[in-house]
């Protein structure tokens, strides 16, 4: 797992961010959703499944344009049954247990493309986000 910039990690999935502060994009290869997820919000459910869950997306107030694009991308992936590709964002300094409401633009991060996982949006109601990532066989 190599440390990358977010732009490099997105390029690993042939996805291009619309703007410098966007954390989701659609892959030009297969239309899958590519998302950058905070590592501390990933939970190991066992059996090779990791869950990314945000209880209240409305707390993401520092960057409403990127939040709205993320919501659009989540709706697309859920409605079109598209795969979700994972990029893990980790704080370089001290991870906060609760990241909601924090301006992520001010946090020093490193990114890791997690190509051995494929996800699915299992819940998205406008506020609650739940994506399950399964380990790909033979990875």
Residue ranges of predicted features:
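Short helix-coil boundary/hinge micro-motifs
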Residues: 1-138
């Amino acid at each position: 797992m190599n440390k990358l910039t977010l732009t490099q990690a997105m390029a690993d999935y042939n996805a291009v961010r619309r703007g410098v502060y966007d954390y989701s994009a659609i892959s030009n290869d297969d239309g899958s959703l590519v998302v950058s997820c905070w590592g501390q919000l990933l939970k190991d459910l066992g059996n090779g499944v990791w869950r990314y869950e945000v209880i209240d997306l409305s707390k993401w107030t520092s960057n409403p344009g990127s939040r709205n694009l993320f919501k659009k991308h989540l709706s697309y992936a859920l409605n079109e049954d598209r795969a979700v590709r994972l990029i893990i964002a980790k704080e370089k300094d001290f991870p906060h247990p609760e990241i909601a409401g924090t301006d992520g633009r001010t946090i020093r991060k490193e990114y890791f493309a997690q190509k051995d996982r494929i996800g699915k949006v299992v819940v998205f109601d406008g506020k609650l986000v739940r994506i399950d990532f399964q380990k790909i066989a033979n990875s």
